[in-house]
Swiss-Prot record:
Stated name of the protein: Homeobox protein ttx-1
GO cellular component, one term: nucleus
UniProt entry tagged with the keyword Nucleus: yes
Annotated function: Probable transcription factor. Binds to a motif including the sequence 5'-TAA[TG]-3' in regulatory promoter elements. Modulates expression of its own, and of various other, genes in the AFD thermosensory neurons or AMsh amphid sheath glia, incuding the nuclear hormone receptor nhr-38, the LIM homeobox ceh-14, cyclic nucleotide-gated channel tax-2, receptor-type guanylyl cyclase gcy-8 and VEGF-related protein ver-1. Required for the development and cell fate of AFD neurons.
Pfam families noted in UniProt: Homeodomain
Organism: Caenorhabditis elegans
Main location: nucleus
Protein family (similarity comment): Belongs to the paired homeobox family. Bicoid subfamily.
Length: 391
């Protein structure tokens, strides 16, 4: 049997060996002797059996001698049985409720940590006792019946080294495992019976007959009153509000089409009668043509093109004879002979160009030409000092 103690110092073992007088060498006959080997603080009693009637017992304190456990007998020496066995005393102390402490272990367990067993905090990870010493302390603490009885808490007396938390307690490893962190739970109020979300109304689809009735009223008036709207609603079997909204959208569409077609003459062309003024046969179209910028694909666009056609027909009516006379009285027709104008190249663009040089109007004053051969004499202080010939 071997006992290895890593917590006790080596000096205490040496003293124990010296007190038992196990070191030395001797001889004996017909008996069992034991050899003790100490290796770096390891106390290993190794009894040996001899059958020749003589045996030798030796003790060595060298650190280089090792004794194999297979070569030794499992039965301890009688000399060791007489003294205090450390393992038996340790088991007796633990049975009596003593506390085992180690000078190299600083782990202590506070009894107040049992509060976490009663707390509903499920996010505490699964923990266990760190060392066997801590487990022994807890076991010795709960075995004391007189100190703090824990029977009312429902905990087992033998705590051992199992987890302080319940074994069936589930601790999620990530946030996605938590049922309260999902998006479905965040919208819990949407599933409540008192919470009613406003549903969007479906778009009304008009049939061809309904559009024909509405377009016929739109040609008559663009702003029908309540009575006309109710009459239309009764005919097309739709609410009056739908009729009102349709007229509102139809007016907006008409304004938009008018803006796009009015500036460009290529969009809508209204052609009148193209023919001779003498009342002969017409070479062009006898009626008005409507050429929309884009082909009408819906019934509403067809009706709108008909409205534009009627307006063009009214504008393309030829003026009457009386209207033509009134126009001729203000505007003289321009003949083809007077189409060209000749300009005189010699005339200049001056106000006097319309008069010839000989026919200028006479003015009241005339210029007289003086004699160029006369001599002009100038006097200065009565003396004729300045004389010069005028040429």
């Amino acid at each position: 049997m071997s006992l290895t103690s890593s917590s006790a110092p080596s000096d205490s073992i040496v003293e124990l060996i010296q007190s038992q007088n196990l070191s030395g060498s001797g001889s004996g006959t017909g008996g069992n002797t034991g050899s003790t080997t100490m290796n770096s603080g390891n106390f290993i009693p190794t009894p040996s059996l001899t059958g020749t009637g003589a045996s030798q017992s030796s003790g060595s304190a060298s650190s280089g001698n090792f004794v194999s456990p297979d070569e030794t007998d499992t039965k301890p020496s009688p000399s060791l049985m007489d003294h205090n066995d450390p393992t038996s005393s340790l088991s007796q102390q633990l049975a009596q409720g003593a506390t085992l402490t180690s000078p190299y272990s600083t782990t202590t367990v506070d009894p107040s940590s049992l509060y976490f067993q009663l707390s509903p905090m499920s996010y505490i990870p699964n923990v266990s006792s760190a060392t066997t010493v801590a487990a022994a302390n807890m076991s010795a603490y709960f075995n004391q019946k007189s100190a703090y009885p824990t029977s009312h808490l429902g905990f087992p007396s033998n705590v051992g080294s199992h987890s302080f938390l319940q074994s069936n307690m589930y601790i999620p490893s990530s946030l996605s495992d938590c049922p309260t962190a999902t998006m479905g739970s965040m919208s819990w109020n949407a599933n409540q019976p008192g919470f009613s979300r406003k549903q969007r109304r479906e778009r009304t689809t008009f049939t061809r007959n309904q559009l024909e009735i509405l377009e016929s009223y739109f040609v008559k008036t663009r702003y029908p009153d309540i009575f006309m709207r109710e009459d239309m609603a009764h005919k097309i079997q739709l609410p009056e509000s739908r009729v009102q909204v349709w007229f509102k959208n139809r007016r907006a569409k008409a304004r938009q089409q008018k803006k796009t077609l009015a500036p460009s003459n290529s969009g809508v062309t209204c052609s009148g009668n193209n023919g001779s003024t003498g009342g002969g046969s017409s070479n062009g179209s006898t009626g008005s043509e409507v050429q929309p910028s884009s082909p009408a694909t819906t019934d509403s666009e067809l009706k709108f093109s008909e409205v534009i056609k009627e307006e063009c027909d009214e504008q393309s009516i030829s003026p009457s004879a009386d209207d033509q006379k009134g126009v001729n009285s203000y505007i003289n027709p321009i003949s083809s002979s007077s189409g060209t104008t000749s300009y005189n190249g010699t005339s200049s663009f001056r106000p006097q160009a319309q008069y010839p040089y000989a026919s200028y109007p006479a003015y009241d004053f005339q210029y007289s030409q003086s004699n160029t051969n006369s001599t002009n004499t100038y006097t200065l202080d009565g003396n004729s000092t300045w004389k010069f010939q005028m040429s």
